[in-house]
From Swiss-Prot:
Keywords: Acetylation, Activator, Cytoplasm, Disease variant, DNA-binding, Isopeptide bond, Limb-girdle muscular dystrophy, Methylation, Nucleus, Phosphoprotein, Repeat, Repressor, RNA-binding, Transcription, Transcription regulation, Ubl conjugation
Protein name: Heterogeneous nuclear ribonucleoprotein D-like
Stretches the record annotates as Necessary for its nuclear import and export: 396-420
Necessary for interaction with TNPO1: annotated span: 342-420
Organism: Homo sapiens
Stretches assigned to coiled coil: none
Comp. bias (Gly residues): 323-342
Length: 420
């Protein structure tokens, strides 16, 4: 068998730069030489790849084992988290010292030392602030006559407790001082109370005819306690429709507590029920519940609930109200409006009542809820706690009621109920 002769013709190289020694080799073994311009860039690729690999490895390790940062925070999955061990209380040094001293005081009280040289005054060093808060000493003697206690009216809205204390300290040592503020807005209500250590200091204050503080004349008066005053158990219900039956009244007011007596006043001229009544409970708790809401829907009308006042309080206030303020007449004999309505001043004698609080400030205090100055109230009988405080309530008797018969032809007469 004949062997074909070897090819003498070799194809030309594909690239001119290919070496001649490779021309006779198979093309599958040949690789072109990389361009010269890429050669300087190749060394920098290796470090970059190494850095990327290191980052990937670090992220993998971090995900498996979270590392702690400064302050105790940890990183897991690329997010910061706050472990339970990081809950620390950062307090200033002064707060820490006060807390440590208070703890030491409590320990000393529970386990008093055998050494008698440690006095109770030392133990009370940090507890005096809580035990003798503002007004605490004044409230402590509210049921007793204290000759060193004074009522200060006509204060400026800008007068602070410090200003009042500094002014009155020139007359004697001030043991306690408080300025009453609105519980909602925190603004001063223009009056306060002061307790002197010595009763003679009160006489010194009263000897001076005129007192001026913060550019305004103030009016200090001696506090007089109303001894033996019982908590209110009797309420006045105004605006009651005469059509409301006694059974309806018992059913509604009996839900608040046990009723002792119900008074339904009658008009002696017309022999008809008047537009108000009185409810007496066996204790004061139902009265507190009733006064939580001023108006109550009873029967077909809305009624207003107030605390009834004794006769002597009413007479005293009527003497003060002569001259215009708190007058019961509502314009030309009672009713305006073409003379068809009958003006019933059914709260005559109950213009001022013992409210749930000194302006709803505290359930133990009675007084003027709408106090806007010091004019027009009884300095000898204002009420702070069990201290009587005179007029200043909104005049309830001036309101008109259309309940009852309407007088014809402009006959406007008033049903003036006298106090019990």
């Amino acid at each position: 068998m004949e062997v074909p002769p070897r090819l003498s013709h070799v194809p030309p190289p594909l690239f001119p730069s290919a070496p001649a020694t490779l021309a006779s080799r198979s093309l599958s073994h040949w690789r072109p030489r990389p361009p010269r311009q890429l050669a300087p860039l190749l060394p920098s690729l290796a470090p970059s790849s190494a850095r990327q690999g290191a980052r990937r490895a670090q992220r993998h390790v971090t995900a498996q084992q979270p590392s702690r940062l400064a302050g105790g925070a940890a990183i897991k999955g690329g997010r910061r988290r706050r472990p339970d061990l990081f809950r620390r209380h950062f307090k200033s040094s002064s707060i820490q010292r006060s807390a440590a001293a208070a703890a030491a005081t409590r320990t000393a009280r529970q386990h008093p030392p055998a050494d008698s040289s440690v006095t109770m005054e030392d133990m009370n060093e940090y507890s005096n602030i809580e035990e003798f808060a503002e007004g605490s000493k004044i409230n402590a003697s509210k049921n007793q006559q204290d000759d060193g206690k004074m009522f200060i009216g006509g204060l400026s809205w800008d007068t602070s407790k410090k200003d009042l204390t500094e002014y009155l300290s020139r007359f004697g040592e001030v043991v306690d001082c408080t300025i009453k503020t609105d519980p909602v807005t925190g603004r001063s209500r223009g009056f306060g109370f002061v307790l002197f250590k010595d009763a003679a200091s009160v006489d010194k204050v009263l000897e001076l005819k005129e007192h001026k503080l913060d550019g305004k004349l103030i009016d200090p008066k001696r506090a007089k306690a109303l001894k033996g005053k019982e908590p209110p158990k009797k309420v006045f219900v105004g605006g009651l429709s005469p059509d409301t039956s006694e059974e309806q009244i018992k059913e509604y007011f009996g839900a608040f507590g046990e009723i002792e007596n119900i008074e339904l006043p009658m008009d002696t001229k017309t022999n008809e029920r008047r537009g108000f009544c009185f409810i007496t409970y066996t204790d004061e708790e139902p009265v507190k519940k009733l006064l939580e809401s001023r108006y109550h829907q009873i029967g077909s009308g809305k009624c207003e609930i107030k605390v009834a006042q004794p006769k002597e309080v009413y007479r005293q206030q009527q003497q003060q109200q002569k001259g215009g303020r708190g007058a019961a007449a509502g314009g030309r004999g009672g009713t305006r409006g073409r003379g068809r309505g009958q003006g019933q001043n059914w709260n005559q004698g109950f213009n001022n009542y013992y409210d749930q609080g000194y302006g709803n400030y505290n359930s133990a205090y009675g007084g003027d809820q709408n106090y806007s100055g010091y004019g027009g109230y009884d300095y000898t009988g204002y009420n702070y706690g069990n201290y009587g405080y005179g007029q200043g309530y909104a005049d309830y008797s001036g309101q008109q009621s259309t309940y009852g018969k309407a007088s014809r032809g402009g006959g406007n007469h008033q049903n003036n109920y006298q106090p019990y």
